[in-house]
Design a protein with these regions (language model features):
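N-terminal extension/subdomain marker
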Residues: 1-36
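Residues that form generic nucleotide/phosphate-binding pockets
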Residues: 14, 41, 46, 75, ...
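A general marker of short, structured functional hotspots
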Residues: 16, 43-44, 53, 121, ...
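Short alpha-helical hairpin
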Residues: 34-54
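Basic- and aromatic-enriched surface patches that contact anionic nucleotides/nucleic acids
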Residues: 58-185
């Protein structure tokens, strides 16, 4: 039987790592958002995801098993209380996740259908993803799709002539649900 660690979902590739000290004196922004929408977590959709980083010193984002990932995504979709993700903005304008990498990565995984085996992960691991990681990702995807549904299904429900009524209500709610942010200086 595999160890518990081997059953955890590896979401480490979903937030780029960067030296916490990396800095450039070009930051002039003083206003910061107070929450992140799920649409900001899509690849190539906006400014947030390309700017977000995880400090090199932080642990790997691979401590949650499939059930915990599913439960968190379900809690978000249902509009339940989610603790704030703590962020810090560098002088270069990079956004570092100080606390909440697993929460943020789980939502990025859902929005992009990458549970450690797709676009982000393939790029970071240069196409070399271990078979056990692929299997864990597949199992996680199946559980998420069964218990929550695919992110793309929620998007499709908004324009469908005959959507699933429950999915449609949740899709409409996702327009106003966001992950809260706390900024530190």
């Amino acid at each position: 039987m595999p160890s518990k660690k081997n059953r955890n979902v590896n979401l480490d590739a979903l937030i780029q790592r960067e030296d916490f000290e990396a800095s450039d004196e070009n930051n002039t922004s003083t206003s910061k958002v107070s929450s992140i929408s799920i649409r900001d977590m899509k690849i190539n959709n906006g400014f947030f995801l390309p700017s977000v980083r995880k400090p090199d010193f932080q642990r790997e984002t691979a401590d949650w098993d499939a059930e915990k990932v599913v439960h968190f995504i379900q809690s978000f979709v249902n509009g339940e209380f989610i603790p704030s993700v703590i962020l810090w903005r560098s002088q270069a304008g990079l956004i570092f996740v100080i606390d909440g990498s697993h929460r943020l990565s789980s939502l990025i995984a859902w929005a992009n259908d990458d549970y450690g085996d797709k676009e982000f992960s393939l790029e970071v691991y240069e196409g070399e993803i271990p078979n056990d990681q692929k299997q864990i990702a597949k199992t996680t995807r199946e559980k998420v799709n069964k218990e929550v549904g695919q992110y793309s299904d929620y998007i499709a429900a908004l324009s469908s002539k005959h959507p699933d009524p429950e999915v449609l209500v949740k899709a409409r709610n996702l327009a106003t649900i966001a992950l809260p942010i706390q900024w530190i200086d």
